[in-house]
Amino acid sequence: MTKPQTLIIATNNANKAREFSAMLAPYDITIKTLADFPNIPEIKENGITFEENATKKATVVVEATGLPAIADDSGLMVKALHGDPGVFSARYAGDHDDAANNAKLLANLGGVPEAERTATFHTTLVALKPSGEKLVVNGELAGRILIAPRGDNGFGYDPLFWSSKFQKSLAELTPAQKNQISHRGAALRQLMTKFDEWWAKA
């Protein structure tokens, strides 16, 4: 069964879209994003789980376009903060502002020693077809939160997230290095192993 020619990544985040495009480059798929469909209504991410938010995004996009879509919801879970910011990661400081989110995270971890600043990045990906056939996969990356930002690459909480594998923050890695270990990369690799079977279903 051939794979679809066009897939919509349900995001307006250009950084996230680039990560998906890089991971999907080996496949013969045309990638589009919400930027290509300005008439799609705003998607409210008000679910209480990553899967609920991702499913909501994918459903809105599929219904509006008639094309298959992949949506993700990702977040940072910090053990010392009882799993926060979690599903609220993108709007932790009140709106979608990386600098403000990072500042709030550092403030809330004030006084917590480095050894106890363990954290996990989580991604849930939902692939949805117009037929309603749904595939859900997850990916995670364990690490810890630094005391101060490091690096100029990446986005979101990347400057604060320490990779033990590379002994660098995610923002100090090249895009290729980040894709090797990232939670989104792990979820996407898992998705692609199941992609053909998912697409072959009615």
Curated annotation (Swiss-Prot):
Enzyme class, first EC level, given as a word: hydrolase
Q: Which Pfam families does the UniProt record give?
A: Ham1p_like
Please verify whether the record's keywords include DNA-binding.
Answer: no
Q: Which UniProt keywords apply?
A: Hydrolase, Magnesium, Metal-binding, Nucleotide metabolism, Nucleotide-binding
Q: Where is the active site?
A: 73
Q: Name one GO biological process term.
A: nucleotide metabolic process
Q: Which cofactor(s) are needed, names only?
A: Mg(2+)
> Which residues does substrate bind?
11-16, 74, 155-158, 178, 183-184
Write down how the cofactor binds this protein.
Binds 1 Mg(2+) ion per subunit.
Gene3D superfamilies the record matches: 3.90.950.10
A GO MF label: XTP diphosphatase activity
CDD domains per record: HAM1
The catalysed reaction is: XTP + H2O = XMP + diphosphate + H(+); dITP + H2O = dIMP + diphosphate + H(+); ITP + H2O = IMP + diphosphate + H(+)
Xref: PANTHER family? INOSINE TRIPHOSPHATE PYROPHOSPHATASE (PTHR11067:SF9), INOSINE TRIPHOSPHATE PYROPHOSPHATASE/HAM1 PROTEIN (PTHR11067)
- Provide the family line: Belongs to the HAM1 NTPase family.
Q: What is this protein called?
A: dITP/XTP pyrophosphatase
